Amino acid sequence: VPDSALAPAIALPPPPLSLLEGAALFLDFDGTLTPLVHRPDAVSVDDILIDLLARLRDRLDGRLAIVSGRSIATLQELGFGDFQLAGTHGLEFAKSGEAIEGPARLPAIDAVESAFHAFADDRPGLLIERKSISVGLHFRGGQQWGEQADALAESLAKEHGLVVQRGKMMVELRPGGADKGSAVQVLMRLPEMMGGVPVFVGDDVTDEEGFVAASELGGAGILVGAPRPTAARFCLEQVAAVRHYLAQGAAQLG
């Protein structure tokens, strides 16, 4: 997202419950529905969250989707198999009972994964996250390596014709051609989502494209976390506030 699309880092108001009336709701996962964890494979999803999202989806006549940087396979393993899903930043799609739609894993991703492992071997605290069609390098546990990790990702992206996706304390290499904004556009064309007003909830810079797409389609973005330059119109301070807002919305819509 270009800087010109981002408003300054000011305190944004909380979203009104009326925003959910008639909404097509797009929810990021990590840092939005569940707190960020030191290791991405250490995250867990509780039944209370799944039940809340299912209830909210029913209140919205099916207009709810999870839009995540995680792969569809991982989202399904975490318990979201009954929901409309967009994974790997909009490169994959799936809904309950249907096969995953998305590109095959490129040989270049395997080459990048090997390079990431070689880089991490003598740099403690780094973690490689293998995804179905991409690979991430996390430096939350070794922040001193962040600049080197970013430089390596840029070099490998140029070498293999891939896209660098930056997130919180991580870099990821993946094929181009999609982001969370394009995911919103694709999902809004589905019969079960059409007619809704898009509302995108997310915490990371990777969610900015989702905020922009929602706004362009007449909706709004909700930033989760501290104020920063953003295309979102509203803000919720933390994951607990997101869950409270969604629970209130489900009750009101019921």
Model segments located where?
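Short amphipathic alpha-helices in soluble, non-transmembrane regions
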Residues: 112-116, 148-157
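Non-catalytic pre-domain segments flanking phosphatase-related domains
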Residues: 1-29, 33-37, 48, 188-189, ...
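Active-site phosphate-binding/coordination module
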Residues: 44-130
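Charged, glycine-interspersed solvent-exposed loop segments at helix/strand-loop junctions
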Residues: 127-143, 162-174
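Substrate-recognition "cap/lid" segment bordering the active-site pocket of phosphatases
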Residues: 88, 94-114, 165-195
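The start of beta-strands in P-loop NTPase/AAA+ ATPase cores
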Residues: 23-25, 63, 83, 198
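Short, structured coil segments at secondary-structure junctions
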Residues: 79-82, 160, 216-217, 230-231
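Mg2+-dependent phosphoryl-transfer enzymes with acidic/Ser/Thr/Gly-rich catalytic loops
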Residues: 2-9, 183-254
